[in-house]
């Protein structure tokens, strides 16, 4: 009847809609995992979305931000905040060649940034030798990712804790670190969080594995016409062990009636990751299959 019947709400808000929602809903905490480019017809450049959020986030909202994201880490500078992040791992492949790097220059003085390490795109740690700008330190820090045991170690404001790794990608680890940071700020203990995390699984609509005969079939979803999302999946395919055949089904069902979408996103996407000796075959499907073939040929596949 127009009255709140719960004490707590967890809301996922569309960035574009935030300007309409935040005047009426003032979150206690706001978690932003990252800001990247989206499809051309929707959000396009990350700075466009940054400006919308930066102007409309309520002053009293405490932010939980990714210290490794040089875009979202700068949101609403006057607000109270904590940061989460992932330390550089000993066996981690960094600074992979990529088309999109949205923060090559210092956001404060415009000089070229020096990256201490770049995990992918603009995710990593950087500093400016001219004005002193640098990536913030993480309050909630993933210090160790143990792929063999499927566990991660985190420093929760200086206190060490061990958690199950939910998912296998670095994106999954960032999502988990962000969730742990928010819940820690709410006052949940590491032991409470451990018990809850043990029950978590990645939904199969996003990622699934199935054994068919002697073949391991992996399905991974990327956001439609999104160059960063597709590039991350391509990188994951490249880094997966063993010989691989890749089937690209990149058509967006939402565009089924209008298949003449802007194809420029294909040339922002790192198809070069598929130019790898471990990939023995690439199959393209859908109405844009010939466009994908041309892009693959340009990538040397």
For each feature predicted by the language model, list its residue ranges:
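A conserved segment at the C-terminal end of the G1
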Residues: 1
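A short acidic, amphipathic alpha-helical/loop segment
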Residues: 19-24, 71, 196, 232-236, ...
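Flexible active-site lid/hinge loop adjacent to a nucleotide/diphosphate
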Residues: 4-6, 10-116
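Active-site beta-alpha connecting loops in nucleotide-dependent enzymes
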Residues: 203, 221-300
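Gly/charged, well-structured mid-domain segments that form the phosphate/adenylate-handling core
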Residues: 133, 144-149, 182-224
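Cys/His-rich short segments
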Residues: 87-153, 166, 277
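A conserved, hydrophobic alpha-helical segment in the catalytic core
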Residues: 24-34, 123-137, 164-198
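Glycine/charged-rich beta-loop-alpha catalytic/anionic-binding loops adjacent to active sites
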Residues: 91, 156-165, 211-217
């Amino acid at each position: 009847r127009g009255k709140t019947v719960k004490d707590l709400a967890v809301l996922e808000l569309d960035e574009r809609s935030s300007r309409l929602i935040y005047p009426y809903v003032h979150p206690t905490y706001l978690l932003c995992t990252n800001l990247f480019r989206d499809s051309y017809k929707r959000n396009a450049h990350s700075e466009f979305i940054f400006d919308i959020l930066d102007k409309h986030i309520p002053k009293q909202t405490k932010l939980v931000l990714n210290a490794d994201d040089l875009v979202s880490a700068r949101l609403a500078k006057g607000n109270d905040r904590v940061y989460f992040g992932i330390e550089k791992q000993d066996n981690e492949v960094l600074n992979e060649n990529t088309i999109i790097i949205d923060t090559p220059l210092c956001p404060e003085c415009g000089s070229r940034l020096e990256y201490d390490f770049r995990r992918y795109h603009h995710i990593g740690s950087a500093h400016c030798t001219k004005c002193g700008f640098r990536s913030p330190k993480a309050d909630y820090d993933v210090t160790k990712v143990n792929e063999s045991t499927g566990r991660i170690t985190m420093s929760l404001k200086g206190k060490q804790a061990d958690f199950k790794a939910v998912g296998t990608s670095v994106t999954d680890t960032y999502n988990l670190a962000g969730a742990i940071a928010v819940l820690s700020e709410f006052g949940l203990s590491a032991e409470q969080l451990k018990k809850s995390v043990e029950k978590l699984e990645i939904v199969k609509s996003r990622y699934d594995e199935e054994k068919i005969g002697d073949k391991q079939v992996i399905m991974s979803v990327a956001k439609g016409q999104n160059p960063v999302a597709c590039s991350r999946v391509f990188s994951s395919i490249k880094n997966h062990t063993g010989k691989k055949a890749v089937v690209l089904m990149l058509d967006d069902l939402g565009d089924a009636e209008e298949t003449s979408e802007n194809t420029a996103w294909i040339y922002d996407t790192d198809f070069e990751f598929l130019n790898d000796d471990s990939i023995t075959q690439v199959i393209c499907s859908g109405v844009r299959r010939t466009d994908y073939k041309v892009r693959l040929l340009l990538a040397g596949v």
